[in-house]
């Protein structure tokens, strides 16, 4: 279990990236969402593990609504189950994985991505769960292809994201599209924008 990206995601590793299949899927990265409400409602996961193999049997994601009247009250937020991985994704695969003792193996998750390719409703529901239903937009065409590619790219050299090198110092802030870090760990971009404004 690794992460964080502030989103509900996973990535599959393969013994042979040239022949990605359920047979070559050999590792998993579970990327949990954040308690920080920057990309959706706060959420956390509880994993169920096999006590002998330590394989993941299921996880349940819990979330709270930012719009709830109790969110910032003295009683605190109310956490409720958002979804179970096995209950949500288990029925999607050709041989449904629903029994409590069945592991959610890398092969299982590869088969889930195959189901996403064929079942657009299931894929769009996955996209909505990434942010716990917050700010959801449709992901079709290249977006869908890239997202499924990324789910199958646990090793960095197979990453599907397109990186544009360089720094863009546009003066027109309406045209500038700056991707902010959701963790707010670096203030360099903000500082450079302020300097550019003063120079302009």
Predicted segments with their positions:
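Active-site glycine-centered loops adjacent to acidic/histidine catalytic or metal-binding residues
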Residues: 3-4
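Metal-dependent phosphoesterase/phosphodiesterase active-site architecture
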Residues: 7-200
């Amino acid at each position: 279990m690794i992460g964080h990206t502030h989103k509900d995601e996973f990535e599959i590793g393969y013994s042979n990236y040239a022949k990605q299949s359920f047979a070559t899927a050999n590792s998993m990265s579970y990327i949990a969402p954040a308690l920080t409400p920057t990309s959706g409602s706060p959420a956390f996961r509880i994993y169920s593990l096999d006590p002998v193999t330590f394989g993941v049997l299921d996880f349940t994601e819990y979330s709270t609504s930012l719009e709830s009247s109790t969110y910032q009250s003295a009683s605190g937020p109310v956490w409720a189950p958002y979804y179970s991985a096995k209950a949500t994704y288990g029925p999607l695969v050709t041989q449904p994985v629903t029994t409590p003792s069945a592991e959610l193996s890398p092969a299982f998750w590869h088969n889930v991505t195959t189901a996403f390719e064929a079942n657009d409703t299931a894929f769009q529901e996955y996209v909505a769960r990434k942010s716990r239903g917050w700010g959801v937009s449709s992901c079709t065409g290249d977006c869908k292809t890239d997202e499924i590619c990324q789910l199958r790219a646990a090793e960095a050299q197979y990453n599907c994201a397109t990186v544009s090198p360089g720094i863009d110092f546009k003066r027109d802030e309406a045209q500038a599209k700056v991707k902010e870090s959701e963790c707010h760990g670096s203030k360099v971009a903000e500082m450079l924008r302020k300097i550019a404004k003063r120079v302009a």
